């Protein structure tokens, strides 16, 4: 029985670009819900493979929204999104220079998200998958 379990785990090479793209979309959509964002608009619907090397591709997704408090500053909105993201999926900060976009990655899901609120009261989130096998 142990040999069967060991062999069955060998074929799992991780998600395809399509699978990771669907996960990315779900994470960003859920993030907007958890942030209680208003007037959410998809800026990049994703869902298509972008070639990035030998039989591999990546996918993207992005959205913008408004905050209930239009005077909320971009850095504060990014921090709010960061807090909400922790209840959506495990991402780690890879770049946060303060008063600038926050870049996060998930090794588990093979995705990257950038929190980049551009102006007072406006959320902006975009992301992409790693370069993964095409589906």
Task: Write out the residue ranges for each language-model feature.
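Generic structural signal for short, solvent-exposed loop/turn connectors between secondary structure elements
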Residues: 13-14, 45-47, 97-98
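Extracytosolic low-complexity repeat regions of secreted or lipid-anchored proteins
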Residues: 71-135
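Compositionally biased P/S/T/G-rich terminal and signal peptide-adjacent segments
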Residues: 19-62
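Generic preference for hydrophobic/aromatic residues in regular secondary structure cores
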Residues: 42-43, 58-67, 115-116, 125
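Functionally engaged cysteine thiol sites
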Residues: 10, 48-57, 111, 129-133
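C-terminal motif of bacterial Sec signal peptides marking the signal peptidase cleavage site
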Residues: 5-9
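Sec-dependent N-terminal signal peptides
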Residues: 1-2
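Terminal, regulation- and interaction-focused segments at domain boundaries
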Residues: 10-16, 51-83
């Amino acid at each position: 029985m142990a040999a069967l379990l060991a062999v069955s785990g060998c074929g799992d090479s991780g998600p395809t670009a399509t699978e990771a793209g669907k996960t990315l979309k779900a994470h960003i959509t859920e993030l907007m819900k958890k942030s209680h964002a208003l007037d959410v608009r998809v800026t990049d619907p994703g869902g298509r493979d972008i070639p990035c090397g030998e039989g591999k591709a990546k996918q993207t997704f992005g959205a913008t929204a408004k905050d209930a408090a239009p005077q909320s500053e971009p850095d504060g909105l990014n921090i709010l999104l960061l807090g909400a993201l922790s209840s959506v999926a495990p991402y780690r900060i890879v770049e946060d220079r303060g008063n600038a976009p926050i870049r996060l990655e998930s090794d588990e899901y093979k995705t990257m998200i950038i929190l980049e609120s551009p102006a007072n009261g406006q959320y902006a989130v975009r992301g992409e998958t790693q370069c993964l096998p095409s589906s």
